[in-house]
Amino acid sequence: MIISAASDYRAAAQRTLPPFLFHYIDGGAYAEYTLRRNVEDLSQVALRQRVLKNMSDLSLETPLFNETLSMPVALAPVGLCGMYARRGEVQAAAAADAKGIPFTLSTVSVCPIEEVAPTIKRPMWFQLYVLRDRGFMRNALERAKAAGCSTLVFTVDMPTPGARYRDAHSGMSGPNAAMRRYWQAVMHPKWAWDVGLNGRPHDLGNISAYLGKPTGLEDYIGWLANNFDPSISWKDLEWIREFWDGPMVIKGILDPEDARDAVRFGADGIVVSNHGGRQLDGVLSSARALPAIADAVKGDIAILADSGIRNGLDVVRMIALGADTVLLGRAYLYALATAGKAGVANLLDLIEKEMKVAMTLTGAKSISEISGDSLVQELGKSLPTALAPMSKGDAA
């Protein structure tokens, strides 16, 4: 199979993975309107082509939180990553480390903090949810700090799980889910051998370490559903700061007022994100939300963005809309499921090449030169910058 883009990895992952795993990462909330808009809105962002700009010394290096990234990309936290490839978190972290970008370990990873951190040179980031069990949260923060994690990604857009209809149909949840997953695994022998058998244990490593007992997929569904905390408030950031003195990024911001509050409560960064369209269907795409948020807090706090990013051109678009760096989620998981560490490494190489092409043809020699000036502004006045659909004349 020829791999030239993230879409090729998606097609390959769909063949490789049991349906319950493919649709768990591929799907979104409710009717998946926001999931689609994340990609569609970003694809409508039009860039200004510039020529004769002498682009011989182009650089993608990006400073962030006292680190220097080789390009403005980090791997996002993805739950159950180790179910998509054998010890998947370790493989993905190795690919990110080799590329010179951060890897973010999810609270609900298969591989625990202590297994992943020693395998890479670059300090990884750690993601944490607000949960009813504050003992678990404190334990996770202390373990992340002891393992040398540099940055905390605090996910705040899950006070309750989103309703994901695909999961009930695919076997991740719903009637007879365990039996359906078993038969799906039998019908996908490559995954069953490589991950199902040789990727064990399939514990939720960070939770097992705290509870002192093995935790499987059913525990993941039950324990998390009962532990998300709807009482979450900005005051929780003050509690977090008692146990974490490093950079803290608030993930799940879609409104400028919330972005201002993040600044006011001492966050070091925000992630403009709708959780990949997996939480509340019908909210703004990240691309639509980003310009107003950047107008409100640019320069006061680091702005990261995710949701809908599938290639290097999308990275440039997000930065032009106001992001400093992006998080890559689904795209890297497709690559991981297809070819493990090598797949993620190849995807990151593709993204780097695509970014260089986009920057060369827009006349931006560095990441700092990508801005609103890189956008075509006259596509329409009624929608946020550069997000109005083109007319028939424009499309020509």
Swiss-Prot record:
Any one GO biological process: lactate metabolic process
As for membrane topology, the entry says: Peripheral membrane protein
Q: Which cofactor does it need?
A: FMN
**Annotated localization:** Cell inner membrane
Molecular function, one GO term: L-lactate dehydrogenase activity
Q: Which UniProt keywords apply?
A: Cell inner membrane, Cell membrane, Flavoprotein, FMN, Membrane, Oxidoreductase
Q: Name one GO cellular component term.
A: plasma membrane
Q: Which InterPro entries does the protein's record reference?
A: Aldolase_TIM, Alpha-hydoxy_acid_DH_FMN, FMN-dep_DH, FMN_HAD, FMN_hydac_DH_AS, LldD
Output the Pfam families linked to this UniProt entry: FMN_dh
**Entry binding sites for substrate:** 24, 129, 164, 278
Q: Which reaction is catalysed here?
A: (S)-lactate + A = pyruvate + AH2
Query: Which amino acid positions bind FMN, per UniProt?
Result: 106, 127, 155, 251, 306-330
Q: Where is the active site?
A: 275 (proton acceptor)
Q: What class of enzyme is it?
A: oxidoreductase
PROSITE patterns given in the database record: FMN_HYDROXY_ACID_DH_1, FMN_HYDROXY_ACID_DH_2
Provide the E.C. number(s) assigned to this enzyme: 1.1.-.-
The record places domain FMN hydroxy acid dehydrogenase at 1-380
Top-rank taxon of the source lineage equals: Bacteria
The role this protein plays is:
Catalyzes the conversion of L-lactate to pyruvate. Is coupled to the respiratory chain.
Q: Which NCBIfam families match?
A: L_lactate_LldD, PRK11197.1
Of which family is this protein a member? Belongs to the FMN-dependent alpha-hydroxy acid dehydrogenase family.
Which protein is depicted? L-lactate dehydrogenase
